[in-house]
């Protein structure tokens, strides 16, 4: 029997016009948007799904980076998420958003993925404007509409 997340993922794939996507044996489903934004969905449990945006490698050469990330995380928390987290296996910074499955639709999932993508763009630009670059072979500053972003926003 399929989980609620699997059923939603099937309907989401149909809505956006791709053949089929599914969760792997680790209950993760990863895909790229415009070959720039890497998103992973986690079938965490039957109550919610997690949406992760892969931002890039954690730069260890900038002493202010950790403090800036804490500042950004507070701002995101005050404005409805997503939250910043660290994935030790890939040594990468992620944006994570909890997506409740009650009353979930493909449209709602798409909207919340868009929140994560816009938050990734904003985070990347604010950090870039402070001289901090996340190592990410896919997300290039030239590919994101450039601006003078100095403040974080949650993409909502």
From Swiss-Prot:
Chaperone for the type III secretion of Tir. Probably stabilizes the protein, prevents inappropriate protein-protein interactions and aids in secretion. Its main location: cytoplasm. This is Tir chaperone. It comes from Escherichia coli. The gene is cesT. One of its GO terms (cellular component) is cytoplasm. Belongs to the CesT/SycH chaperone family. GO terms for biological process: protein secretion by the type III secretion system. It is found in: Cytoplasm. It comes from the Bacteria. Keywords: Chaperone, Cytoplasm, Virulence.
């Amino acid at each position: 029997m399929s989980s609620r997340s699997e059923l939603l993922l099937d309907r989401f794939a149909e809505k956006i016009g791709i053949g089929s996507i599914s969760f792997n044996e680790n209950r993760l489903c990863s895909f790229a948007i415009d070959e720039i934004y890497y998103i992973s969905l986690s079938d965490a449990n039957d109550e919610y799904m997690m949406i992760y945006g892969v931002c890039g490698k954690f730069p260890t050469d900038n002493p202010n980076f950790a403090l800036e990330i804490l500042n950004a995380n507070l701002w995101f928390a005050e404005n409805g998420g997503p939250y910043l987290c660290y994935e030790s296996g890939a040594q990468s910074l992620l944006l994570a958003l909890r997506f409740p499955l009650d009353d979930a639709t493909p449209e709602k999932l798409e909207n919340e993925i868009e929140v994560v993508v816009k938050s990734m763009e904003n985070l990347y630009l604010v950090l870039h404007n402070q001289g901090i670059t996340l190592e990410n072979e896919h997300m290039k500053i030239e590919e994101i509409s450039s601006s003078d972003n100095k403040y974080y926003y949650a993409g909502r």
